[in-house]
């Protein structure tokens, strides 16, 4: 038996906590015997003194075990259970292709995803632009669709990592969000509760990333890899670029349309293709479905070419309540905005820089994202045909096409697009799509 205030005092005084002490505190949060004040004090003590790697592992495991941990053994999957998590960005639609591609190669991907908040788009919001798609199925349906389609992308249920929900709500109002120990435990507790065999983290870098600098992104990636492996789940991370919109589109229905076109081969944005392939290949190698990256990429290209990946996506959509003919008739099902017209550059030169966060907020401003969690979403609005950094620009060059509900909304978005794309006389230095891979042995 421990006293909560003694645990808080130890952390306040920068004394390392034991796994039992951390577990006691987190169980108290889940059972609601800890007050909000105690949670806030605990979070602030961690914020100022941080945690050792052993403490981070203990915190993550305690939060994971605060609710249901899914056990897939009764499903008799004949392949590894794998997943990917992204720190989020703009036009980051990789999950919608990655899940089906890995499934088509023999993996099982029970992906529990989130909604968009702030400038980042949410995978669930994108999928809910598909009529009938149910993001909150029963556990039995979740398991059955994962088995039948190889992939099921759904929302977090209340019984997964409930302690994280309380801790996060307190962090949000006490200025303790941006601490790597707390971020690591929050991300991993939810992911590891899904009963994964292996995980790949996509940690974004750049103007649209969650972390403010390359170094901070790298520190987070290293923390997640070390802690997840310490908690018993084989995990690697890729640092990928978010200095510009990743896909050609930003906006819910627009991104789903692009994902379908990617899977069917109708259109594949080169940067989106490279990042998606890199993440998928990492998942195949991690889980033993491929012996090396080269073999993995060959397998992935094959399931794109032969249509197996597209079939898996179609099965998932139908299995979760969406149209059975979605892949064939997606354009009829996805909502369209009344206005779709380009915004042109006002000067000549090169697309030199993007404030990707600002472009994401332009989509939010149109109703395509949330300012607060209770906001409703307009699935049709957004940006498409995004210009790429390094492209030559003149006054006849479209920076993007804006999909809006009214002329006034279009004009407001056009102003935001122009303000967040820098045109310069010189070409920018190219940035890699994938900066580096981080594995347990690299730390």
UniProtKB/Swiss-Prot annotation:
Q: Which UniProt keywords apply?
A: Glycosyltransferase, Transferase
Q: Does the keyword Protein transport apply?
A: no
Name the family: Belongs to the thymidine/pyrimidine-nucleoside phosphorylase family.
Recorded protein name is: Thymidine phosphorylase
Swiss-Prot/TrEMBL catalytic activity: thymidine + phosphate = 2-deoxy-alpha-D-ribose 1-phosphate + thymine
Q: Which domain of life is it from?
A: Bacteria
Q: Which organism is it from?
A: Photobacterium profundum (strain SS9)
What job does this protein perform? The enzymes which catalyze the reversible phosphorolysis of pyrimidine nucleosides are involved in the degradation of these compounds and in their utilization as carbon and energy sources, or in the rescue of pyrimidine bases for nucleotide synthesis.
Q: Which gene encodes it?
A: deoA
**GO cellular component terms attached to this protein's record:** cytosol
Mind telling me which Pfam families this protein's record contains? Glycos_trans_3N (PF02885), Glycos_transf_3 (PF00591), PYNP_C (PF07831)
